[in-house]
Amino acid sequence: MQLTRYQFEIMNYLQSNQNCFFDLRSISDKICVSSALVSQQLEILEKSGLVDLSDKIIKVTERGLLVLEQYRVRKAIILAAGFGSRMLPATKDKPKPLVLVNNVRIIDTLLDALIKAEINDIVIVTGYKGDRFNELLNKYPTIKLVNNPIFDKTNNISSIMTVLNQLDCCYICEADLYISNPNIITKYQYCSNILGSYSLQTDDWSFKMNNGFIDQYQKGNTYCYNYYGISFWTRDDSIKLKNDFKEVYNNGGTNYFWEFIPLVLKKDNYQVEIRQCQKEDIMEIDNYYELQQIDSSYK
């Protein structure tokens, strides 16, 4: 059984808040859908045996969880090969994702969020001082480490090429994002999307929305969405990504950021949504000065 978008959003919310008191307004507010529409869709879901409402408690049934499985995120690919030169001297002897921020490694905030969402198939593509990532195995014994031997000769598209065959219903994540709100990583996703927060003006990488989908990916923009390096790709889009990455990379496109392929060069092949988050959900630490402002031990 295929779910409509509204049905998915309702069930996704309910499964993350199992056995909650039935409050139509709360559901409506959380998923940004009118109460009337939520009520209508809940009636359909209940008649289909996907949700159960009894004694003012609402929950997703076992059958409902089976239906949600088709939207399950299967794995996460984390790109961690870069040097992080702007973070020197903190990155002199370790990669940026392993830098401690208030006694927590940056990458741990992402790994903990993934594991909390029951996404345990995690591949980390390493490069600069790649052997240092072995220390993660003590806390995260199931992660897989894959080395990109040409990380310093190409852009991060080469890291994607290193694990190309593993693209399938997966998150693609940058490793140097400090996750303040782990709930931005969810177990289920309906369609291909990229995290973004609304901004009146930015000098950083950003995009706009056109008919509901990402458009005008560029550096610097107004009335736009800041690009955050956490995206999800469906099975169908993963297949297209594999073909498009191969075509671009094998024809001299070794110096592209990987996201340029689906968002710019081959954008007509994709319809990628913006999954909105708040600026405070993710902390981007771009340089050593910003690190000092967040963690006084570096001053």
Task: Give the role of each language-model region.
Residues Q2-D29:
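Short amphipathic alpha-helical interface segments
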Residues N134-W205:
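Conserved beta-loop-beta/alpha segment of the NTase-like Rossmann-fold superfamily
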Residues C32-I44:
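Short amphipathic alpha-helical interaction segments
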Residues L3-Y6, K56-Y71:
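Short, cationic-aromatic polyanion-contact patches
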